[in-house]
Amino acid sequence: MYKDQTGVVPPKDVDVILCAPKGSGRTVRTLFKEGRVINSSVAVFQDVTGKALEKAVAMGIAVGSGYVYETTFEKEVYSDLYGERGCLMGGIQGMFKAQYDVLRANGHSPSEAFNETCEEALESLYPLVAQNGMDYMYKACSTTARRGALDWAPEFEKACKPVFERLYQSVRDGSETRRTLEFASRPTYRKDFDKETDAIADQEMWRVGHVVRSLRPNRK
């Protein structure tokens, strides 16, 4: 993938495989040490030995995958770059920030805005969705929350879908790879990166979050 930009071309006489756990490296390590699991995708780009898929699956088992599913290098790259820019990280930051800012603009306190936007989602609702599915959440919440969530979900889908379509196209046409390589190749990469992440850390929402997290009982 994107070999014209990366210059990475594998030798013709070796198996080329991948095993991609569906989580951050930190999560994979933590779950592995706890004897828990995370799912992984596996793919074969080049099978010289006739055992490439077997090796990829073995790698998935070795890192503690709950189950593995087969994909292709292309689909894995596209879905990975797309996902981390969308619902996994970029989209979360953007959605949290938008909701928080609207609450603050309408007179809600920083603590209330953060708790109603981030804390409740991350500490309570998202883990329940992970364990039981979204349909469970609709059935387990109040009738007020249920009706509102059912009504507004299509609105968010309609608003977000064009953004996700532009994002996927940017991944597919190589724009995201190009931008990443250019940014990561700068002599000032670390300084520039720190400036961007420091700006996020300095947003009121996440400054409030730092305080809220410190007040959790399990932090004491």
Where are these regions (language model features)?
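A contiguous, surface-oriented mixed alpha/beta subdomain in the mid-to-C-terminal portion of proteins
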Residues: 80-81, 85-88, 92-96, 109-113
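Rossmann-fold dinucleotide-binding core
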Residues: 1-85
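NAD(P)-dependent Rossmann-like dehydrogenase/reductase catalytic/cofactor-binding core
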Residues: 36-39, 43, 47-51, 55, ...
